[in-house]
């Protein structure tokens, strides 16, 4: 037999969670690899009067398909008011001494690939694309087609406009782009969605199992308390062992209304609070299942001080009866512990007879036989 088919859910839980963790780890690794970006160090230099000013900072981000290498050149924007370089006929004012140059292009109007293609056809060594107006210095790794030997970098709108204003004032601006640091974006939108669903599922099942454990703990306490109460309550009910000569074992006497069998010597009977008695093995499960006397419908458990819903707890009470209550005692032990002396029975057991006997017969009957007469003699089941 395959042990995997016979193992319990608890034994399979560690393997299940290990498999789930491995799956999450693989997904996260894939997401992280796809979301790895490289920053760009940019050294921007320009002349102001007789002074040479430069600014160095990690202000750019390489495109996803850009080659990662160092590049330097003069910054050249498109000619005219439209700076997005989406038109294939876009022109650039190239340096006179044929210096390497890098195109400065505004984002928007077309795809990034189109902008890069226009600049590369004019001989640009690299392309710097600055973001939309109103985005500040926000940048992100651009998705574009790969171009051979072309460096593609995005910078913020503020930095791009500063460079553009300097160039429009006639300032000669050069830039050197170097590969910066590698950054891994752990939480892209796919991974975030997956984690949200997974976390919500785990939270639901965790809450569900905690609630089940809490309810089970309360039920366990309830049944333990009920067991103690039932032990105490059933200990209050009298138990008697029938003997030869008792009126109850007479062939003409009434039988047990539960099993419909006649009473026999050495059988154990339990006397209820209503003074009716039956076979102990018959009446105990009956009380636990119905809670009442099968003859007069007296609420036995209520009379013993136990308040509960019998219909909801029938099966559990019967289990408690078989496992916890003193019904497991042998007949000898029950006779020793619970048998009532004949002299005391007369003060506690009443006699219910629909057809009273004559005074002559009553006078000729021994007192002991009178006291041990069946309390339910001549009664019908209600």
From Swiss-Prot:
Pfam annotation, one family: PA
Deletion phenotype: Male mutants display severe subfertility. Sperm cells show an aberrant head-neck morphology. Female mutants fertility is not affected.
Record note on modification: Auto-ubiquitinated.
GO-annotated cellular components: endoplasmic reticulum membrane
Membrane topology of the entry: Single-pass membrane protein
Recorded metabolic or biological pathway in which this protein acts: Protein modification; protein ubiquitination
Zinc finger (RING-type): 256-297
GO molecular function list: transferase activity; zinc ion binding
Subcellular localization: Endoplasmic reticulum membrane
Keywords: Endoplasmic reticulum, Membrane, Metal-binding, Transferase, Transmembrane, Transmembrane helix, Ubl conjugation, Ubl conjugation pathway, Zinc, Zinc-finger
Protein name: E3 ubiquitin-protein ligase RNF133
Organism expressing this protein natively: Mus musculus
Higher taxonomy: Eukaryota, Metazoa, Chordata, Craniata, Vertebrata
